């Protein structure tokens, strides 16, 4: 299957790759409506109003609860709940990553491809923390305007860096006040699969080049990437599309992802001297008191969540 992506393609939050950020925010809103389950793991009070502001009917109805179980066939209703739970687990992992990083004294953070991420507004950042959000200009501008209309105030010194990650984003980051001599906490949430293999390696190299010793990085992806895993992910995404197509959502999500041979991020970073730890989504479900999603219940199969620390030798 070829990708629908091309060199220089751009998007907003209602099209192409940008729509995946709206999809994830809608899933966070679904989780929030389950306070005894997924909503107890992670809650994003800004998810629903942000999705509503984007204006994609299917995701608006999903986020607001208008697309409820009575309207859905059983398979789609269950799949939607599972998707919300999976995104709650993912959200909590990256929330905890930042909280742990700042507890260690880190006061500089970067969110790459920030989309509709609201951590700048909802996490309890320590005084003196600077948080950089990097994404395409249309995405950055929309989120700033929408959250301003909602009366939301950042809980950190939030700095928007409106630049495509295929451009010289490190220069734009430094221009916004980023200090590469300070320890940094980086996240690339839901990003790497939308990059070709060589672009993924380049991104990791760029992060490493700007990371002082003791900096931290977190991301997620498929374990042991190979043709079988890629085909499994493609099949799962196609099944998700078929469910949602019945309710007016018409976008081939699999066509946005690059299914090419690549070194997984954990292996790549470990080879460069980073200390890498990992946890599977099944382990995280159990840790947070949720029933793990097995087999076809898991929207994207088994996902591995990675956290890495750059040691002194890697920084030398």
Curated annotation (Swiss-Prot):
GO terms for biological process: methylation. Gene3D superfamilies: Vaccinia Virus protein VP39. It comes from the Bacteria. Its EC number is 2.1.1.-. GO terms for molecular function: methyltransferase activity. InterPro entries: Ppm1/Ppm2/Tcmp, SAM-dependent_MTases_sf, SAM_mthyl_Trfase_ML2640-like. SUPFAM superfamilies: S-adenosyl-L-methionine-dependent methyltransferases. It is an enzyme of class 2 (transferase). S-adenosyl-L-methionine binds at residues 135, 164-165. Keywords: Methyltransferase, S-adenosyl-L-methionine, Transferase. Pfam families: LCM. Belongs to the UPF0677 family. Exhibits S-adenosyl-L-methionine-dependent methyltransferase activity. NCBIfam families: mthyl_TIGR00027. This is Putative S-adenosyl-L-methionine-dependent methyltransferase MMAR_1069. It comes from Mycobacterium marinum (strain ATCC BAA-535 / M).
